Amino acid sequence: MKNVLPPFIEIYRALIATPSISATEESLDQSNASLITLLAGWFSDLGFNVEVQPVPGTRNKFNMLASTGHGAGGLLLTGHTDTVPFDDGRWTRDPFTLTEHDNKLYGLGTADMKGFFAFILDALRDVDVTKLKKPLYILATADEETSMAGARYFSETTALRPDCAIIGEPTSLQPIRAHKGHISNVVRVLGQSGHSSDPARGVNAIELMHDAIGHIMQLRDSLKARYHYEAFTVPYPTLNLGHIHGGDASNRICACCELHMDIRPLPGMTLNDLNGLLNDALAPVSERWPGRLTVAELHPPIPGYECPPDHQLVEVVEKLLGTKTDVVNYCTEAPFMQTLCPTLVLGPGSINQAHQPDEYLETRFIKPTRELITQVVHHFCWH
């Protein structure tokens, strides 16, 4: 059965040629059903049992779980099937045609991160999966680039408890054991419109927001002073004011003002605690102007994540790669997988190429990635 698998580069080519864009804007959002069908067929050909799982609350999106072996524990290799949208005017190549040039593989998803599944399939084509002593699971998730709905749903519904998991995000084969979380909120102030010639007849939402921003900046300074994790390049929680809009005319008292902001918490900081700190910071404004200020989520929050540095997974991977694990400021699906088992983020390609025009993966990653997957499968599923 295994000899029916296409060559590595043809698997890669087929994955890139199958669009699976995730976007909050409905006109850009795409189902990943075709890509899931491709993966399900290939893993079935390798002898895996394959389950396709609809993801609730999405626009026709699916997870795929391929499993082989029996018993408890084992290894989970996982990644997301979706990509970000692309700016056609900034790409010099067809995003959906895998192009090899100057020791690089170009295409949307080559690094982030559909290509990871080509590496898994290629590494397993010569493995007799019926002889594994522990289970091997391959998970392909949906909607990582927007809501992380696939990983959230899987982690909430699965009974699986592998020994460990590896998420193949592009880390330049540098193992990552911790990252910050992400909370994005909209602060909305409702004023009362009126003619600017008589300020007393209205409530200016921009002025109230100015007061609110002052308190938010105090919270930012407090987070920086109170919380530290020196392994991060930015060793404290960050708070960013990303977008503000209010009013519609210079001669009209502003009736509504909105601020979009985010906080990136350190591992160990709970989302409930952070929301409480934000509400406490804004309490003076709310008390002075009852009913005029609200805070709501822009996107589902992502907690910070950390894999214990002394876990066997960390020790094994550090030994195989000859390098220490690191921490990063960006987010992945790791917090959700970590609820099931100790998890590392580790994959080919550079995060610097993610979400960029002319995205590419350097071919120098091909051999070591295939070897790494072979080694971790052997260690965690054969011993």
Curated annotation (Swiss-Prot):
Residues at the active site: 82, 144
UniProt xrefs under SUPFAM superfamilies: Bacterial exopeptidase dimerisation domain, Zn-dependent exopeptidases
Binding, Zn(2+) 1: 80, 112, 169
Predominant location: cytoplasm
Gene Ontology process terms (BP): L-arginine biosynthetic process
GO MF annotation: an example: acetylornithine deacetylase activity
EC number: 3.5.1.16
Subcellular location: Cytoplasm
GO CC term (a single one): cytoplasm
Biological pathway: Amino-acid biosynthesis; L-arginine biosynthesis; L-ornithine from N(2)-acetyl-L-ornithine (linear): step 1/1
Cofactor: how bound: Binds 2 Zn(2+) or Co(2+) ions per subunit.
Cofactor: Zn(2+); Co(2+); glutathione
Domain of life: Bacteria
Subunit structure: Homodimer.
Annotated function: Catalyzes the hydrolysis of the amide bond of N(2)-acetylated L-amino acids. Cleaves the acetyl group from N-acetyl-L-ornithine to form L-ornithine, an intermediate in L-arginine biosynthesis pathway, and a branchpoint in the synthesis of polyamines.
Family: Belongs to the peptidase M20A family. ArgE subfamily.
Name under which the protein is recorded: Acetylornithine deacetylase
